[in-house]
């Protein structure tokens, strides 16, 4: 069995590995459209830990495991109290013995890091307060799939230095992941937001190191909406999440109307600009209906590619761990178990006949 690898952060991947995952995603998407997804994870189980509810993450991982011939076990919020009823170490070890992979959507990044530290099977990061790497893989794959300048090119032939991605809004975990994967590939990333909600310096430092390694790209954090001009991608996210409801009014005042993605903003970006949103969206709050439902929007194609991404990631990380027994070995154990059960069946029938005969004799007396 190969050494266990985990998917915690796109920073852990090389450019070559990202392209490998993209190629795998493309093959599996084509196979799904043909109704011919190979059952590469047949009889395998994925434990899915959710510390908060989710629609797209849960459905996409469950559907992906089903298509690949496996099964996803949903461990809902409140069902597991990680580190409370049972230590995180113990929970991880138990799941490692029963399942073939663990996906975790955690409140804290530390939880996923510790899962990966203790697990004997691959751990996939389904979202934390710091990042959302499965979303990032999905998003860049979608960008390259739909941008006219890139959709017909091999990944190695793409001029990433010519691509401009503009993220408008709060410094969310999606913003963090988008900044880091785009700069790792050598793209130009711009975060436009009120100063209070701009990306922190530690995120920018990682992006600058990525740019240095890629030898192309740039990163800019600003409150200047003029920087949206020439964007290939205009991306936004919710202004607040469920645990920030008490800040909602304050955040609306900070973002509205200046940082809403409106038809006028998309016009400023240019006709080439495509609109993206990780969803769920608060319509007519961070984005207007006229934008998310427009021909420039690929938000729902992006959502579909969550399934594509999960299929690719599950195969990339779980498949190498599978012990691929020969048919002869499978036939041996099948025969052995069937022979045992046939013997048990005969024994049971004999006991059943004896008990019935005994009962009838007793009743006659």
UniProtKB/Swiss-Prot annotation:
One of its GO terms (biological process) is putrescine biosynthetic process from arginine via N-carbamoylputrescine. The gene is ptcA. The record marks 29, 145 as: Important for structural integrity. It comes from Mycoplasma mycoides subsp. mycoides SC (strain CCUG 32753 / NCTC 10114 / PG1). It comes from the Bacteria. Coiled coil: none annotated. It catalyses: carbamoyl phosphate + putrescine = N-carbamoylputrescine + phosphate + H(+). Keywords: Cytoplasm, Polyamine biosynthesis, Transferase. One of its GO terms (cellular component) is cytoplasm. This is Putrescine carbamoyltransferase. Belongs to the aspartate/ornithine carbamoyltransferase superfamily. PTCase family.
